[in-house]
Amino acid sequence: MDSNIQNVVIDTNVIVSAFLSSHDDVATVLVLNKLYKNEIRLYYSKEVLAEYKDVLNREKFKFDKREVNRFINYVLEKGIVIEPEKINEELIDKKDLPFYEIVMDKSIKESKLITGNIKHFPVKPFIMTPTEFIKIFGK
């Protein structure tokens, strides 16, 4: 594995924001592009995959099914599924816990959690917004 590739966990809100955006130069779209270009390595769990599928297929978003399938297929083919150790941590939104558990898992070296809901998580240098991630690691 290439040591220059960042290990990441991507919160669902980042994917939703990227899908909703009509601009190619916004941070959420740039993060998704880095993923599709294999410039970042995605880690996920069964719970995270289930949330991706559930949220991205919600009728209210009216996302193109091909785009949703492209993302889910990418996750399944290129992402790395893990079963993280359960953490007894109180987060503002309990649905964020699976993402936090992955980024905190000791088996993943120097992972980053990319989220649009930074306030939902403890303040840690490896938990960042899409804009912060792009500023640090480039487009």
PLM segments and residue spans:
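PIN-domain endoribonuclease scaffold, especially VapC-family toxins
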Residues: 32-87
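Residues that scaffold the ATP/ADP-binding catalytic core of kinase and kinase-like folds
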Residues: 17-19, 55, 124, 136-137
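Acidic, PIN/NYN-like endoribonuclease modules and their adjacent C-terminal/linker elements
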Residues: 108-139
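Acidic, metal-associated active-site segment
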Residues: 93-114
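Short, well-structured N-terminal submotif of metal-dependent ribonuclease cores
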Residues: 1-44
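Short, glycine/charged-enriched secondary-structure capping and boundary segments
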Residues: 22-25, 30, 58, 126-130
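Acidic, metal-coordinating catalytic cores used for nucleic-acid/nucleotide bond scission
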Residues: 89-95, 119
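Alpha-helix capping/helix-boundary segments
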Residues: 14-15, 48, 99, 119-120, ...
